[in-house]
């Protein structure tokens, strides 16, 4: 018997995802046509012996989250429950707080997945490795180049046994080119060391600032507190993957993750990819079109385009490397490149909405998406263009490398600006 835990965080996280996270919780943002965490749930549901999936976070159980959970339970025929933290408890604190629910039924092991990662989720391979050599902690790792490794948790392993000898979260100097993917397989006994850390922090009064509202509530961070302390003690091991993987921290990384998942659909869900049909729009590359969307036959879509529910795409529209969300309208002959068009937004005819991609170096197989700051030297860096929900773009204007907050009605062109 197996279980899975998906750590979805809370509204105090995901600030780099704004303005998209204003409308829906970040874990429910559509990536390649389905909510971000549905990719996680699909992967977990395919593991033989999976009995229950638990979501742990600090979001209020509002209507979108409740509706998603009900639909997911029906689709995957698995119990899927949301466990709300009383305060933000960190990646390890939530596991310890809900340890009784996780261990109920006596699971052999349980997966722990961070919600803000994109991956092909090699969970069965991790389970095989765990059963071959059972250990308390098994981490999924991948490789990064020397420069980018500093932005992740770095793992020094024993090449023969794959034991984690040393772990450093976001080191200041190069430690290792093996990085933590944020996907784990834990044995039930892992909750004992979490309890020791919890008690130690309680006794020492070492509480995170986020827990001050609840005196006595301990925050435990798996990466900084647990992995760093237990590395080299024969408890933590790493399973390396060369499959797809990326963090989803910013809106730009969501667009890149959508591209990765759309490419995966060729193997996993070919039925989700649009096909070129007589009288239909021209499809180039991997494109997802929701069944309720209305797309004019003269539109040209792709590659790497995701069109959401109820979207209207007019005659002569050109769409490339973009996400168009629920209820948006692209009027005749608009051009949308490297952009995200928000819920219910309208782009006027002959308008152009364009961004600048910040993709990994295609010549470096170990390169990953950078989650850089929006600004450098007081100037907005060129990035993808984001239209918040219910934005109105007039006809014949250019919106380039800009972020438009929700409910704005523009009257002219903008370049390299945040429109509040």
From Swiss-Prot:
Ranges for region C-loop: 356-384
Keywords: Cytoplasm
InterPro entries referenced in this protein's UniProt entry, alphabetically: GMPPB_C, Hexapep_transf_CS, Mannose-1P_guanyltransferase, NTP_transferase_dom, Nucleotide-diphossugar_trans
SUPFAM superfamilies named among the record's database cross-references: Nucleotide-diphospho-sugar transferases
GO biological process terms held by the UniProt record: biosynthetic process
Purpose of the protein: Regulatory subunit of the GMPPA-GMPPB mannose-1-phosphate guanylyltransferase complex; reduces the catalytic activity of GMPPB when part of the complex. Mediates allosteric feedback inhibition of GMPPB catalytic activity upon binding GDP-alpha-D-mannose. Together with GMPPB regulates GDP-alpha-D-mannose levels.
A GO term, aspect molecular function: transferase activity
Pfam families the UniProt entry points to: GMPPB_C (PF25087), NTP_transferase (PF00483)
Expression sites (tissue/organ): Expressed in the liver (at protein level).
Chain sites annotated for binding GDP-alpha-D-mannose: 85, 247
Assigned protein family: Belongs to the transferase hexapeptide repeat family.
Stretches the record annotates as Substrate-binding domain: 2-251
Residues covered by region (Hexapeptide repeat domain): 273-420
Compartment(s) of residence: Cytoplasm
This protein's name: Mannose-1-phosphate guanylyltransferase regulatory subunit alpha
Subunit: Component of the GMPPA-GMPPB mannose-1-phosphate guanylyltransferase complex composed of 4 GMPPA subunits and 8 GMPPB subunits; the complex is organized into three layers, a central layer made up of 2 GMPPA dimers sandwiched between two layers each made up of 2 GMPPB dimers.
Name of the gene: GMPPA
Cellular component, GO, one term: GDP-mannose pyrophosphorylase complex
Domain remark text: The N-terminal substrate-binding domain adopts a Rossman-like fold and has a binding pocket for GTP or GDP-alpha-D-mannose.
């Amino acid at each position: 018997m197996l279980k899975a835990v998906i750590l979805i965080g809370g509204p105090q996280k995901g600030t780099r995802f704004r303005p998209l996270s204003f409308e829906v919780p970040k874990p429910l943002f559509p990536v390649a046509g389905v909510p971000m965490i549905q990719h996680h749930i699909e992967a977990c549901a395919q593991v033989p012996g999976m009995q229950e999936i638990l979501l742990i976070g600090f979001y209020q159980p509002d209507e979108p989250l409740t509706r998603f959970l009900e639909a997911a339970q029906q689709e995957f025929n698995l119990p899927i429950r949301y466990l709300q933290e009383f305060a933000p408890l960190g990646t390890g604190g939530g596991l310890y707080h809900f340890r009784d629910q996780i261990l109920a039924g006596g699971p052999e092991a349980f997966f722990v997945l961070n919600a803000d990662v994109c991956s092909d989720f090699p969970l069965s391979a991790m389970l095989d490795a765990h059963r071959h050599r059972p250990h308390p902690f098994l981490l999924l790792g991948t490789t990064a180049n020397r420069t980018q490794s500093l932005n992740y948790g770095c793992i020094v392993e024993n090449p023969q046994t794959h034991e984690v000898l040393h772990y450093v979260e976001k080191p200041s100097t190069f430690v290792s080119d093996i990085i933590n993917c944020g996907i784990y397989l834990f044995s039930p006994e892992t909750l004992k060391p979490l309890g020791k850390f919890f008690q130690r922090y309680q006794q020492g009064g070492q509480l995170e600032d986020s827990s001050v509202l609840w005196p006595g509530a301990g925050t435990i961070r798996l990466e900084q507190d647990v992995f760093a302390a237990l590395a080299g003690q024969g408890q933590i091991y790493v399973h390396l993957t060369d499959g797809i993987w990326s963090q989803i921290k910013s809106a730009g990384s969501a667009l890149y993750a959508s591209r990765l998942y759309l490419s995966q659909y060729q193997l996993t869900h070919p039925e989700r990819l649009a096909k070129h049909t007589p009288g239909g729009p021209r499809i180039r590359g991997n494109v997802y079109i929701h069944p309720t969307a209305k797309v004019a036959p003269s539109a040209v879509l792709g590659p790497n385009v995701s069109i959401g529910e109820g979207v209207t795409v007019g005659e002569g529209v050109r769409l490339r490397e973009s996400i168009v969300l629920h209820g948006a309208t692209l009027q005749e002959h608009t051009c949308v490149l490297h952009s995200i068009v928000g819920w219910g937004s309208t782009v006027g005819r002959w308008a152009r909405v364009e961004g600048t991609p910040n993709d990994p170096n295609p010549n470096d197989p170990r390169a990953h998406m950078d989650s850089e700051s929006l600004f450098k030297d007081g100037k907005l860096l060129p990035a993808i263009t984001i239209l918040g929900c219910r934005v109105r773009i007039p006809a014949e204007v250019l919106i380039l490398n800009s972020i438009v907050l929700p409910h704005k009605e523009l009257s002219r062109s903008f370049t390299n600006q945040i429109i509040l």
